[in-house]
Amino acid sequence: MTTQAAEVAKRRTFAIISHPDAGKTTITEKLLLMGKAIAVAGTVKSRKSDRHATSDWMEMEKQRGISITTSVMQFPYREHMINLLDTPGHEDFSEDTYRTLTAVDSALMVLDGGKGVEPRTIALMDVCRLRDTPIVSFINKLDRDIRDPIELLDEIEAVLKIKAAPITWPIGCYRDFKGVYHLAEDRIIVFVPGHGHERIETRVIEKLDSDEARAHLGDMYDDFVEQLELVQGACHEFDKDAFLRGEMTPVFFGTALGNFGVDHVLDAVVDWAPKPLARVANERTVEPAEEKFTGFVFKIQANMDPKHRDRIAFMRICSGKYEKGMKMRHVRIKKDLKIADALTFFSSEREMLEEAWAGDIIGLHNHGTIQIGDTFTEGEVLGFTGIPHFAPELFRRVRLKDPLKSKQLRQGLQELAEEGATQVFFPERNNDIILGAVGVLQFDVVASRLKEEYKVECAYEAINVWSARWIECSDEKKLKEFKDKAYENLAVDGGGHLTYLAPTRVNLSLMEERWPEVKFRATREHH
């Protein structure tokens, strides 16, 4: 096996998806703990030793305690290299989250055992389904009261339309939580609560049909055996091929806070989740084992280093190897760049990188030339597909408090739009600036970042826009007619694309009927 093939085979790149408060930040920290990447989970101290969770780094996140921005963490585990992408868990999240899911090969779904499947989980699963992403499931919070586990599995199947195959099964919950039973291996993993940074030695009872198991379960033993027979009769057996096709999810139970069960999930990612997969470009399919370097940018983030107004472009390597000082072709702008200072990530600890392989995520310093969706190669003209822009669902007009700062406002919004924090529209008929977002929190994020990073204070006003659609039309004459007729509602977005801002759903339907030659698109690929 070549070094390259061996390095690719070691990689596992996955994201965590969940509804807010299902325990995603806690599980992220416990995973880092498994990889010995942090000594004390959740209390990585900065110099001032103020304690805040490792993966939530922007000012606003610190105040609200939610991971607004996607961070990337790399750590070793069992001779493998794990790349973990954290997605914003707040109900108000942006396209950032969707795009992060285009950069991974599998996902870990975290469900709150007391609540089951929640709306955000459904939305994220829809995105995973588009790409048949393999999903490992973790039902969390067994140290509290949870719903009937069989009911939870039924709900996963009915609502998320994926077969659920339990790998472990909980023995009791809350104060009666005794551990989990591993169905295939016929053994009990005993629950010993371990908080924070403690890595507890696990106690295992081999065989359910044993005196030791009877003693541990006590009065619960007979009921548990009966429940297990029911489960084994009713549930799917795990089928790795169905998992890799995105049709079945292995389900684990545990408590991230109690530091129990997280290792079972990480083992599943290593043992079953795919190594870096081939990627589709417009021109051809790119295999990870190819010698030549290729990669695409799925996210841009400003100011990871408060001392520098820098912006980092996050790139997923699709093939070949990154080496410090190598030359790359930036395909969209047809320029060669020498990259000497790519970064690897351990949350906000950033280190310079000597080499990286397919499946890894690296950070490039961006001085305004890199956009989301850009492809980098060693010279070949390629464009990776499937990195979408979604039509925003909420709109506000921006009002400047100091009219002399309109230049800074435009620059700030342009940069925040390139980063994917918001979408910006400039109407044809006036000098308004309209912001579009997927969730309300995005407007707060933009206002606070304009103030902190660009020293611009702005206010928002309601505006009569229901939705935005990107316009495409191959017939020049028809397009001109359309532009003349629809002038009042036309705008140009931050990337220079013609956009129709529909005041109502009815208006949009009428326009689509009236102009069959014009395509009104709700998503747009990054080009």
Curated annotation (Swiss-Prot):
GTP binds at residues 18-25, 86-90, 140-143. It comes from the Bacteria. One of its GO terms (cellular component) is cytosol. One of its GO terms (biological process) is regulation of translational termination. InterPro entries: EF-G-like_DII, EFG_III/V, G_TR_CS, P-loop_NTPase, PrfC, RF3_C, RF3_dom_3_sf, RF3_GTP-bd. Keywords: Cytoplasm, GTP-binding, Nucleotide-binding, Protein biosynthesis. GO terms for molecular function: GTP binding; GTPase activity; guanosine tetraphosphate binding; translation release factor activity, codon nonspecific; translation release factor activity, codon specific. Pfam families: EF-G_D2, GTP_EFTU, RF3_C. Signal peptide: none annotated. Residues 9-277 form the tr-type G domain. It is found in: Cytoplasm. Belongs to the TRAFAC class translation factor GTPase superfamily. Classic translation factor GTPase family. PrfC subfamily. Increases the formation of ribosomal termination complexes and stimulates activities of RF-1 and RF-2. It binds guanine nucleotides and has strong preference for UGA stop codons. It may interact directly with the ribosome. The stimulation of RF-1 and RF-2 is significantly reduced by GTP and GDP, but not by GMP. This is Peptide chain release factor 3. It comes from Stutzerimonas stutzeri (strain A1501). The lineage of its organism: Bacteria, Pseudomonadati, Pseudomonadota, Gammaproteobacteria, Pseudomonadales. The gene is prfC.
